[in-house]
Amino acid sequence: MWPGRGHVRDPEYVFQEQKKGIKPMEANNENPIIQLVGLGKQFQTMNGPVTALEDINLEIRYGEVFGIIGLSGAGKSTLVRCINYLEVPTSGKVVFEGKNLSVMKDREKRLARQSMGMIFQQFNLLSQRNVLQNVCFPLEIAGVSKAEAKKRAEELLTLVGLEDRMKAYPAQLSGGQKQRVAIARAMATNPKVLLCDEATSALDPNTTKSILELLKKINREMGITVIVITHEMAVIEAICDRVAIIDHSHIAEVGNVSDIFSGPKSDIGRQLILGDVAEQNLNFGNSRQIRIIFDGRESSEPVIANMVLACKVPVNIMHADTRDIEGK
């Protein structure tokens, strides 16, 4: 659901950016666009308070694709809703572009929030409006003229590959097409950050791949910071630069995707990345088990054969797989 009138970035500001051709944000991987400092969130229930988040400390950099992963109930969706203040944190602070959201006036907070587009697992399209009208909707709320809103919506629908479906209604679209409309709508007001809460969970693998490629294209070509919330490691390895693993309301570990995949330090990290292999209780007596990682497109050196010759011990390969992480 979109907020009411006045809850969108000022139309004059939005279209100054558009008319001047200014990209929402240039990539700068050294500085944070979002900082979470000691963030906590509790919900009050009939049985007492329930802690959803506790002492969350994160920095998300300009222009990166940042993943937040965890099992169901870990707190990841609450975290993303605290980032844009759809949920008000119980403790700690959210700093957006150097400004603390918790001390902002309501108008400033609304403008900051509208610099963060959001897409969900459920597409939340308006069934009585066609594709073009759905994308125009947030601009209409902002008081943007119909002509300007239509022009912006047409540009975005072309970007997401739906230029031939503008007059179609949500009921006539596939799941992937609906999510593309939702992405276009989330970008209507030129956000600096795109929050994706389980955006591919309801899609089939091929459609998921195409949506992830679209998000990466938006990140690469427009410089928009993308935050991906998911429970699927395949999504993280396909699109993200860095990742935070959340477990039982806490951050378990944070790092570059390649580093986390190569050597997860937390129990939940090993569970998510290694899966069944980490849980196997293999009994080989005093034999050692060694994990070998080839970091690159190919390995021409016969490492296993050389190990056998050098150590003069037999070697069994118990498990092997290949993954494409950061193009490697």
Show the residue positions of the predicted features.
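Non-catalytic connector elements of ABC transporters
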Residues: 2, 10, 14, 284-328
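A short, surface-exposed alpha-helical micro-motif characterized by mixed small hydrophobic
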Residues: 236-238
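Conserved H-loop
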Residues: 223-229
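ABC-family P-loop ATPase nucleotide-binding domain
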Residues: 2-42
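ABC ATPase "signature
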Residues: 254-255, 263
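C-terminal boundary and immediately downstream tail of ABC-type ATPase nucleotide-binding domains
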Residues: 261-293, 311
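ABC family nucleotide-binding domain
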Residues: 30-219
